[in-house]
Amino acid sequence: MPLAIKINPKDNVVVALHPIAKGTAVPVDGASVTAVEDIPQGHKMAIAPIHAGENVIKYGFPIGHATADAVPGTWMHTHNVKTNLSGEIEYSYHPNVHPLAPVAPETFMGYRRKDGRAATRNEIWIIPTVGCVNDCAKALVRDNQDLVTDSIDGLYTFTHPFGCSQTGHDHAQTRKLLAALARHPNVGAVLVLSLGCENLTHEQFLTELGEYDHDRIKFLTCQDVDDELVAGREILKELAAYAAQFQREPISSSELVVGMKCGGSDGLSGITANPTIGRFSDMLCARGGSTVLTEVPEMFGAEGFLMDRCQNEKVFEKAVHMINGFKEYFISHNEVVYDNPSPGNKQGGITTLEDKSCGCVQKGGSAPIMDVIGYGDAVTTKGLNMLYGPGNDLVSATALTAAGAHMILFSTGRGTPFGAPAPTLKIATNSQLAAKKSTWIDFNAGVVADGEKTLDEAGADLYQLVLDVASGKQTCAEKKGFREISIFKDGVVL
């Protein structure tokens, strides 16, 4: 079992796959480097002299610079490495696009909607347009579980505090996000629940929603009825009868849309779980499916890896606009763009934002980037897509769901229990986490660090698990009933 890994031949550090004690000789490139201090798992060790001001190279890319001279065997982390990042950058397009060889798709057992779209779940959702009716929505879910029969996979609501006391861009984003959730293919039927006096009016929601199936989506305004729980049950009976007509049938994996996200990352994220997701992404895209990469702030410092893979200059310009637009968002709030790695990230071995970003983008595999889409917009292009969204787990996972993701692959080195509205598969970066939190973790990519599987083998295993989940196998979060949303907010609350 290897002690450490040199990710790229250009690197001047290795990453400890397991804790390395001071004095341990670590094999590197046919020789050995002796650790001059303890190196925690997931952390970096210098394998060559690195002078103060010299770049620290990982993934073949500068992830920061040394702030003090370091001899081989030195622990390289926040105490002696700093970021190179600043503000906006002038980007230029240098195409490095390598289309994937097509592969015949497999099938999964999914649902076929009347509009032709594929689905992996057949649920009834109650979507509140305003936080004032959150408890009404929860009561309707609680009191109507008897309607979950036959092929209906569940009755759920997604509460939030917005829909009123918002103006401008925030109000528009809330409206757009909620309408996008109502259109999600995994929803067999939808009850849109309103109060009646909120900023997000019924008419505004209808305008945002556009054309819709009146049997699939129904509305209830609580102020218009004597008892909203009685009226709501009658509507839910109709929606349940509509949703029950859908049955699972064989569907091509080329119709899958899968979101990709990481959270609670550690030093192994970019070595095990994220590249495993990247292998999966390439497999699905080669079969004609779609994957979605988001977390724009966690692309800072590694965006060049992605931009040169844009399929053409139009997509490249959209990517530039997205990256610099998010930097402007930070700067407008007097925030520095590089102040990202969390305490948990740092404890797990991530030192700078470049370090985190280089690991984050591994989820994108090697496929060309076919499109860049905005917050609340749906995926319309096959292949790898980039989505405007923050690094925050709940906000970005909600955005992935709104984009039409049938499920979300979520890598984590620290562990997290949450689930999005779409089935959320947790992928552990290390075997210790997978063993400790077996009720959170769906897939253990730590087998790569343990030497039990190659990345290609782990990616193939993950692909099969995705087909199983698409066919109805529940994720850990689904089994616990963990699912929620969080809406991106920028402005004032009235």
Describe the residue ranges of each PLM region.
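Metallocofactor- and cofactor-centric catalytic cores in central/energy metabolism, strongly enriched
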Residues: 1-407, 414-494
